[in-house]
A protein has these predicted regions:
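NAD(P)-binding Rossmann-fold cofactor-contacting core
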Residues: 174, 181-219
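Short acidic low-complexity segments
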Residues: 220-233
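Short, small-residue-biased leader/transition segments that mark boundaries at the very start
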Residues: 1-13
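Internal alpha-helical scaffold of NAD(P)-dependent oxidoreductase catalytic cores
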Residues: 3, 15-113
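Interdomain hinge/lid region at the active-site interface
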Residues: 63-67, 75-167, 171
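Short, well-ordered coil/turn residues at beta-beta hairpins
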Residues: 29, 239-241, 256
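Alpha-helix C-terminal capping/helix-to-coil transition sites in glycosyltransferase folds
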Residues: 7-8, 22, 232-233
Length: 262
């Protein structure tokens, strides 16, 4: 007769880095069963041995609690992204210097100068999925802040699209990269794709520069292979994350990337 034990670990979103330098190890397991408890500790020890760090904080909650740790951690990050994006929206519309204000706010050590660079919204593999999942899990439980993160992310894309349309003034909108962040090839639920949807609904003419794409079109939109041609065609160049490749056309670029980092 065979028996099996099931354990699970929090998903890493930066696998190559987090496997070597984890901030914590969380191993979820069923609520009871000595074999499963032993298996959980064995699995954690394998992760500890494979890491470059030592004395890694390790938790052994039940499976539901382990999943909740992941969902609440990612939703907190989504809330923080949305907070600094709303700060930036306020400053942009009030004519204030966003960077001055963020720098001043983040000098408070309780807040810190991390995860504070404005963007077009959060996206990627985890944050959109996990925030929606957590809202669904709350059900009838009050959750103003959790739900607001999802709403704020949509409203940020609305604002960005309006600003782009105003700057383009009827000209061609060039989208520089589809990726969710710098040094990534991941398009999944990237914020720029949500902005593109809004631009298309408004009737804007949109072209894309994305060097990882080999096709001539993406989702029905032209993909321009030559960066020089892309710059020539676009009345405004939209970049969720600014790169040095655009430094020669600053007058065309619309970005909210103040620190050139994620």
């Amino acid at each position: 007769e065979m028996s099996a034990s099931l354990v699970g670990s929090e998903m890493c979103i930066r696998d190559r880095y987090d496997n070597l330098h984890p901030s914590r190890i969380v191993v979820g397991r069923p609520r009871s069963g000595t074999a499963t408890e032993a298996d959980a500790h064995l699995f954690a020890s394998l992760l500890q041995q494979g890491a470059a760090e030592r004395d890694i904080p390790t938790l052994y909650p039940n499976a539901t609690e382990a999943e909740a740790i992941k969902l609440f951690a990612n939703t907190y990050l989504a809330v923080r992204v949305s907070y600094f994006n709303e700060l930036d929206t306020y400053c942009e519309l009030k004519g204030l210097d966003t960077r001055q204000i963020i720098d001043g706010v983040c000098l408070d050590p309780r807040i810190g100068a991390h995860y504070n660079n404005p963007s077009f919204g959060y996206g990627g593999y985890c944050l959109p999925k996990d925030t929606r999942q957590l809202v669904a899990n709350f059900g009838d439980i009050p959750n103003r802040i959790i739900s607001a993160a999802v709403t704020a992310n949509d409203e940020r894309k609305d604002h960005i699209a309006r600003q782009i349309l105003r700057k383009a003034a009827g000209g061609v909108v060039g989208v520089y990269r589809l990726t969710m962040k710098a040094d990534s090839d991941n398009f999944r639920e990237s914020s720029i794709r949500g902005v593109i949807e809004r631009l298309r609904r408004a009737g804007a003419s949109v072209v894309i520069y994305e060097p990882t794409l080999k096709a001539a079109a993406f989702d029905g939109l032209p993909v321009v292979a030559s960066l020089a041609e892309f710059k020539r065609m676009a009345a405004v160049i939209v970049a969720n994350r600014a790169e040095s490749a655009l430094d020669d056309v600053p007058e065309k670029v619309y970005t909210r990337d103040l620190y050139r980092r994620d």
